[in-house]
């Protein structure tokens, strides 16, 4: 049971970090600066140091709750660091960062998805609906004068 918690909490933290970044979208990636991610990782490391330093004083459920919070926050910040590095460097760093992420959170990393949501597609393909909308760009505006298409007689 203890090993299950050790594997489940970092995965849950990484899931929460990924959900947070995906929920915010591209604007959230712009807001999530390197300074904020590094500050949160410094906070987690300092919390780890304080927990280790004062862990002999804590007994029972307090020690377990702080330990669970620490493991969850390490997974969360690790996921935010992964997202920030991928945002800054691009998808080229994934083969290098894959083993590091696996060792950091102790689980399997989720596959990166492309712009259209396909997991293994490396090339972005345009949607036929988007192409149709782009082709209709020469149509008149809603309130403007209409012109006839075809051959004028």
From Swiss-Prot:
The chain crosses the membrane at residues 7-27, 31-51, 64-84. Keywords: Membrane, Mitochondrion, Transmembrane, Transmembrane helix. Residues 132-153 are annotated as: Disordered. It comes from the Eukaryota. GO terms for cellular component: mitochondrial membrane. It is found in: Mitochondrion membrane. Its main location: mitochondrion. It is a multi-pass membrane protein. A stretch of 270 kb of the mitochondrial genome is duplicated within the centromere of chromosome 2 resulting in the duplication of the gene. The expression of this duplicated gene (At2g07674) is demonstrated. This is Uncharacterized mitochondrial protein AtMg01020.
């Amino acid at each position: 049971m203890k090993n299950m918690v050790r594997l489940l909490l970092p995965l849950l933290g990484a899931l929460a970090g990924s959900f947070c970044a995906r929920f915010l979208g591209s604007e959230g990636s712009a807001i999530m600066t390197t300074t904020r991610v590094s500050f949160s990782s410094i906070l987690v490391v300092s919390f780890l140091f304080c927990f280790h330093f004062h862990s002999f004083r804590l007994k029972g459920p307090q020690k377990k709750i702080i330990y669970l919070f620490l493991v969850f926050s390490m997974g969360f910040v690790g996921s935010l660091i992964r997202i920030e590095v991928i945002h800054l460097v691009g998808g080229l760093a994934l083969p290098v960062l894959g083993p590091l992420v696996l060792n950091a959170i102790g689980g399997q990393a989720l596959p990166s998805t492309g712009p259209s949501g396909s997991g293994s597609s490396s090339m972005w393909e345009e949607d036929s609906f988007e192409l149709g909308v782009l082709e209709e760009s020469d149509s008149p505006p809603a309130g403007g004068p209409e012109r006839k298409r075809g051959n004028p007689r």
